[in-house]
Amino acid sequence: MVQSGQITFYTHMYSPYCHRVHIALEEVQADYKAVTINVMEWPQWYNTKVNPITRKIPAITYGGPAAPPEDPSPEAVKLTESMVIVEFLADLFPGKLRPSDPVQLAYARLFVALFDTKVHEAFKGFFFMGTPASDLLDQLEGIQARLPETGFAVGEFSIADVAAAPFLARIMLLLENDIGKYPVGEGKKAFEELQKPKFARLMKYIADIKARSSFRASYDHAQVLFIWQNNPAIQRA
């Protein structure tokens, strides 16, 4: 499909939610302009002209006449919330990201819902509050149980994988480097647990995600590691 309107993508590499949108943009091969928002000195123009409702990233503007990113056209559509944007892109570029079979689409959306509740809560608990690793591992095992024997979450790469990929990549990054509020060494122990045969299917799933060109184009391992190493929200006391 020929893209009919401009897309400006407001983002920051720290955010797994922004990463979702970035992967989706690459998957559908959209023509877009990425604008990094300084999250340490949040620009006022963003709060008033791009996302006055939640004042969060990611966001996109779509359509309207050409305009500077800091002063988007009033005619441009402004969209926020990562999965809203991902679904919009799937609509804008039909045949990509969204399964055509209604059952598989329902399964994909269920996968997203489970990830955004169960895995996300365990992610926050372990890395930001230092709760036991067992909950995170249990939730990852639950996600693994929903995977087919081969391929992605519902077979072909879809919105389900777009939702999961940024968090799975960061989970592995943080565990391997023992970053988080949990006791020293607990991250590496959990990382080693994930290398055991019990989690072989999940590890293959993550490897397949990381091998996609959309992931490689949207993820800078060294930069993301540096950002999270210096994130005060997950520093140990």
Predicted feature descriptions by range:
Residues 103, 110-211:
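GST-like fold's C-terminal all-alpha helical module
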Residues 1-144, 148-149:
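GST-like domain detector, emphasizing the conserved glutathione-binding G-site
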Residues 102, 217-226:
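Short, flexible loop/turn segments with low-complexity composition
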Residues 58-61, 163, 219:
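Residues embedded in well-ordered beta-strands within globular domains across many folds
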